[in-house]
Amino acid sequence: MPKQADGVRIVAVDAAGKTSRIKAERLEIDYGDGRRLTLTLPNDGWAHLDIEADVAGDDDGDLPVITIQPSACNAVALRVEVVQQPQVADIDLPVAAKLPVLTLEVQKALDGGDKAAAPKKHQIRRWAQAALRTDAEVTVRLVGETEGRALNLGYRGKDYATNVLTFVYGEEGGAPAVEGMPLMGDLVLCVPVVVREAAEQGKALDAHFAHLVVHGMLHLQGLDHEDDAEAEAMETAETNILRGLGYANPYA
């Protein structure tokens, strides 16, 4: 405990004006209702007097508050009050859902006008991520009509270039082959076919590319359109995803 500074005297004055000198390092004023004020004379530092309010008892909700109000240029009035701290409700907040992780590679096997018409990687990522419901590693390959036709013939037996092809590796029904591992697959977009379709259907080119990426990503995750019920469910999913991306219903 610091010693009282040299030359400092503590004098108590009673109601009759009688003074008594007190030898002390700290004064405690007890108000009798649990409030207590402690005055300490520091032996160093900036302050001439340290004042601390306290509340007796075990109620952690009681908070002592000191209010000071100037009463003159050389005087202040001090008040000690006890306020009840607000109780913090114990609420179980919902945990934010973890977004699926998309590992994306974009390959461009294009030249000339096809290359200029191809979407950018950041666009493809945005469209693919919107349709993603599980972690996935996806390669999107943008090709010309010759490669698109060869792939469609080799894998589907159809001798023409189609707008989008989906290839899933080692998975069945849109689920990873090994639990905990990401879904893996390729999307192949034939750029000149997509450009031609957009013009014929009166659609913005980016809207048509977005639709086909979403369509391919849903195929990758197990959705199909082999019958009317499947087709309706897939079209509804595509429409909702595209609406979230700011695009109109592609089937309207």
UniProtKB/Swiss-Prot annotation:
**Region ranges (Unknown):** 1-90
Per UniProt, the keywords (alphabetical) are: Cytoplasm, Endonuclease, Hydrolase, Metal-binding, Nuclease, Ribosome biogenesis, rRNA processing, Zinc
Q: List the disulfide bonds.
A: none
Please list the coiled coil stretches. none
List, separated by semicolons, the cofactors it needs.
Answer: Zn(2+)
Give the GO molecular function terms: metalloendopeptidase activity; RNA endonuclease activity; zinc ion binding
Q: Which Pfam families match?
A: YbeY
Its Enzyme Commission number?
A: 3.1.-.-
What is the enzyme's main class?
A: hydrolase
Fetch the InterPro entries from UniProt. MetalPrtase_cat_dom_sf_prd, YbeY
Cellular location of this protein? Cytoplasm
GO biological process, alphabetically ordered: rRNA processing
Query: Which residue intervals make up region (Endoribonuclease YbeY)?
Result: 91-252
Q: Where does Zn(2+) bind?
A: H215, H219, H225
Q: What does the note under cofactor report?
A: Binds 1 zinc ion.
Task: Work out whether the entry's keyword set contains Nuclease.
Answer: yes
What cellular-component terms does GO give this entry? cytoplasm
The regions listed as transmembrane in this protein's record are none
- What HAMAP family does the record point to? Endoribonucl_YbeY (MF_00009)
Q: Which PANTHER family match?
A: ENDORIBONUCLEASE YBEY, CHLOROPLASTIC (PTHR46986:SF1)
Q: What does this protein do?
A: Single strand-specific metallo-endoribonuclease involved in late-stage 70S ribosome quality control and in maturation of the 3' terminus of the 16S rRNA.
Q: Which family does it belong to?
A: Belongs to the endoribonuclease YbeY family.
Name of the protein: Endoribonuclease YbeY
Q: Which organism is it from?
A: Azoarcus sp. (strain BH72)
